[in-house]
Amino acid sequence: MFRRMVVMGLVAVGLVAGGPVAGGVTAWAAESPPRRSEPQGPSPSRSGHLPINGLRLYFEVYGELGKSKTPLLLIPGAFLATDSMKPWVAAFAAKRSVVVFDQQGHGRTADTSRKMSYEQFGDDAAALLRALKVERADVMGYSQGGGVALQLALRHPTLVNKLVSLSATYRKDGWYPAVFKAIEGLNTKMFADSPIERAFRKHTPDAKAFEAYVEKVKVLNINDQNITDAQMRAISAQTMVIVGDADGVKPEHAVAMFKLRGGGNEEAAGTGMLTKVPAARLVILPATSHIGLTGEANVLESMVTPFLDDAPPANPSLW
């Protein structure tokens, strides 16, 4: 169990806080307390594989698409698969339909010789939505998945209604340098008999193929992406930025991202009240790490749902 916690701490997104120490265990992983148990959540109403851009891409749908509220697309982090999003599905699926999928090489989607890139993964997400006949979706991505969500919003703006960025950056320098040192130290031995390795070997038993996959994901996250400020301003989807105050993402980067998306309200600063739905929203959870944020689905659902629903801001009467 401890080794499994260490592996998940190391690779939940391929991004951790703290460099390698003896035995390949990061300082973060060595000190991390056990995560509280999360509900298993609902069963998918539809699941399977679709031919998407040369992949047999695995997806799950919860609820009925095309009814009432805009569906929510969830995009997991690096090395993670649909199973990692169960707490988020459980939090949101009672109020809206939810779609989640495994990226190239992740979970039940086999890897191919195709190069990995955030742009390509964004195109894969767009192709999946179109294959499911979803005209427009709210999109929430975690870490690597947050970067993919940004590319989806940039490259396929008509498909994205609202955008929620969980512990993600739009530029490489938004991460602390220790993050990249930790990624560089990852190797296949750290994944031995982990859920990540077992899922991969169900569809691709070749050990060398798994090693190649790990290296591809490392390269993807080390190279990261560099979206310009102008591109960030041009995104049409209203945006919510969420990080932890002990995240791998620098807090000043999250604030910059928030401001580029129209965040900040001088009128509200002057009156002390918000009179209309803000252009962007920012959440910085206290005492919360990059991995810790994944355990806050219920807390964040109460903040994300009003954003997705355009709920008017509350202005309590003080006198």
Language model features with spans:
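Flexible "cap/lid" loop of the alpha/beta hydrolase fold
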Residues: G147-R155, N161-E197
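Short beta-strand/loop motif that positions the catalytic acidic residue
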Residues: I235, V241-V243
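Conserved loop-alpha-helix segment in the C-terminal half of the alpha/beta-hydrolase fold
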Residues: A90, D245-R281, L285-T288, T294
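Catalytic active-site module of serine/aspartate enzymes centered on a nucleophile-bearing elbow/loop
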Residues: L274-W319
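N-terminal cap/lid segment of alpha/beta-hydrolase-fold proteins
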Residues: R36-R56
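Active-site loop/oxyanion-hole signature of alpha/beta-hydrolase fold enzymes
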Residues: V100-M140
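Conserved HGGG/HGGXW glycine-rich cap/lid loop of the alpha/beta-hydrolase fold
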Residues: L55-R108
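Active-site nucleophile elbow and catalytic-triad environment of alpha/beta-hydrolase enzymes
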Residues: E215-Q231
